[in-house]
């Protein structure tokens, strides 16, 4: 196995920069860079880091050696903690590149080696990647649970039950003349039925985990001049959309990302929807607005209080669903006692973006819907499409299984289900998917 290295921290100005070395030459590399021969495992040392050939000082740093298998990768590992300087990073990388039989690590290669050395399964490796990419508290909580082995435990539990079914069926196949109690077949049937129900229910999760990973798309729609762009600017806390009294100012979709209650939200401000427009560009904007609303996880439909009755049309009303927030804006311009027809059928928020009236109610409603769609449950949920694909495939094999068929063929259906689950966790040979998974890591991890 080759010895690899990389800067594990971000390249640039920082208090500390971290370099990781993994492989059989790790200790030798550390000795060459420091001139020190005796390193005890897991003990931190303060050392000068120099070019091995010239002796030129690179930095005064903290270094540590981890003897295999007690390291992140399971191999001999050395770590160097320098000052966070671009110049220091460049010099140390050059020094490492000049040492024979050591190379720069590929993206995710340290984590890949840890997986290959049985430090964790593939789901935990993916959890580490999600943890690095997490931008909100809820994304962090999901990732830390997965990195800690929660999905591995769930999938392995199903796999063990399936292996038990196989062992019972093989007893029937190998010893057909033996008097095996019917209770054994009853146990097979019960376990099989329970697993179908569990996996089916698990898949029927409305993509909660994937939504949390990728972000919930929120489309702001409504007639022209209702205050959609003003709402976007309020939510983003900066002016990213042009606000104007001229109808049709927003022509294309304007997007922004934010954190509401720990949930990642992808905001989309859209063109005002109206039935009559002779402007070809505005017509295309309206078409995109409607498409955005149809694919959104959450919708905010905004109306101008002064023009509400005249601006409601069937195209907008048809977009309302359980994850829609209806806002009546510019409420400061009408009598408080005025009741709108739409309020008889739908719950509406009365706000004034301009005068900061009831704006926190908007945030709370968004958070409530996000929590309902992607909030935590006791059972860890599917976090990416790879898991969902193989679980669906495994469930198909599981549903094909019946004791009325030839037992050898029936057992093969269970084996294929085991293989699908093993592909998720990495229990079986999954070389063809390792590159796809680990390429999404950063260099140094």
Swiss-Prot record:
What molecular functions are annotated in GO for this chain?
GTP binding; GTPase activity; metal ion binding
Residue positions binding Mg(2+): 229, 250
Q: What is its main location?
A: cytoplasm
Q: InterPro entries given for it?
A: G_TrmE, GTP-bd, GTP-bd_TrmE_N, GTPase_MnmE, MnmE_dom2, MnmE_helical, P-loop_NTPase, Small_GTP-bd
Q: What is this protein called?
A: tRNA modification GTPase MnmE
Biological process GO terms, please?
Answer: tRNA methylation; tRNA wobble uridine modification
Q: Which family does it belong to?
A: Belongs to the TRAFAC class TrmE-Era-EngA-EngB-Septin-like GTPase superfamily. TrmE GTPase family.
Q: Do you know which Pfam families this protein is assigned to?
A: MMR_HSR1, MnmE_helical, TrmE_N
Q: Provide the organism lineage as a comma list.
A: Bacteria, Pseudomonadati, Pseudomonadota, Alphaproteobacteria, Rickettsiales
Q: Where in the cell is it found?
A: Cytoplasm
- What is the annotated signal peptide range for this record? none
Q: Specify which residues bind GTP according to the UniProt entry for this protein.
A: 225-230, 244-250, 269-272
Free-text cofactor note: Binds 1 potassium ion per subunit.
Species this chain originates from:
Rickettsia canadensis (strain McKiel)
Q: What does this protein do?
A: Exhibits a very high intrinsic GTPase hydrolysis rate. Involved in the addition of a carboxymethylaminomethyl (cmnm) group at the wobble position (U34) of certain tRNAs, forming tRNA-cmnm(5)s(2)U34.
Which residues does (6S)-5-formyl-5,6,7,8-tetrahydrofolate bind?
A: 20, 79, 119, 445
Q: Name one GO cellular component term.
A: cytoplasm
| Record keyword Methyltransferase present | no
């Amino acid at each position: 196995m080759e010895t690899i290295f990389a800067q594990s921290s971000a390249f640039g100005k920082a208090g500390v920069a971290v370099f990781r070395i993994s492989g059989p030459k790790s200790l030798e590399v550390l000795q060459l860079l420091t001139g020190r021969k005796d390193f005890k495992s897991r003990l931190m040392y303060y050392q000068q880091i120099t070019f091995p050939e010239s002796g030129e000082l690179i930095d005064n740093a903290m270094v540590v050696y981890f003897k295999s298998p007690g390291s992140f990768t399971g191999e001999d590992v050395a770590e160097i903690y320098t000052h966070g300087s671009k110049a220091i990073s460049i010099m140390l990388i050059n020094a490492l590149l000049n040492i024979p039989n050591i190379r720069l690590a590929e993206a995710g290669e340290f984590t890949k080696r840890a997986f290959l050395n049985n430090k964790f399964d593939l789901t935990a490796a993916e959890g580490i990647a999600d943890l690095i990419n997490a931008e909100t508290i809820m994304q962090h909580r999901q990732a830390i649970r997965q990195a800690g082995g929660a999905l591995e435990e769930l999938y392995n539990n199903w796999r063990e039950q399936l292996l038990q079914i196989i062992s019972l069926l093989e007893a029937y196949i190998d010893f057909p003349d033996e008097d095996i109690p019917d209770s054994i077949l009853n146990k097979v049937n019960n376990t099989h039925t329970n697993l179908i129900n569990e996996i089916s229910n698990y898949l029927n999760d409305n993509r909660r985990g994937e939504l949390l990973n990728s972000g919930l798309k929120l489309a702001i729609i409504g007639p022209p001049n209702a205050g959609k762009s003003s709402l976007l600017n309020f939510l983003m806390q900066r002016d990213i959309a042009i606000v104007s009294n001229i109808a049709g100012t927003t022509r294309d979709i304007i997007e922004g990302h934010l954190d509401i209650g720990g949930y990642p939200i992808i905001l989309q401000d859209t063109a005002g929807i109206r039935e009559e427009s002779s402007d070809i560009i505005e017509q295309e904007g309206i078409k995109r607005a409607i498409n955005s609303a149809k694919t959104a996880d959450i919708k905010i439909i905004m109306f101008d209080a002064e023009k509400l009755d005249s601006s409601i049309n069937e195209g907008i009303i048809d977009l309302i669903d359980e994850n829609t927030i209806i806002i009546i804006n510019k409420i400061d311009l009408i009598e408080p006692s005025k009741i709108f027809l739409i309020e008889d059928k739908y719950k509406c928020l009365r706000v004034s973006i301009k005068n900061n009236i009831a704006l926190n109610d908007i945030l709370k409603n968004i958070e409530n819907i996000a929590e309902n769609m992607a909030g935590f449950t006791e059972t860890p949920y599917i976090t990416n499409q790879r898991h969902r694909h193989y679980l669906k495939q495994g469930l198909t094999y599981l549903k094909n299984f019946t004791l009325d068929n030839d037992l050898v063929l029936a057992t093969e259906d269970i084996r294929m289900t085991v293989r699908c689950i093993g592909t998720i966790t990495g229990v079986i040979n999954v070389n063809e998917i390792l590159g796809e998974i680990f390429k999404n890591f950063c260099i140094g991890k």
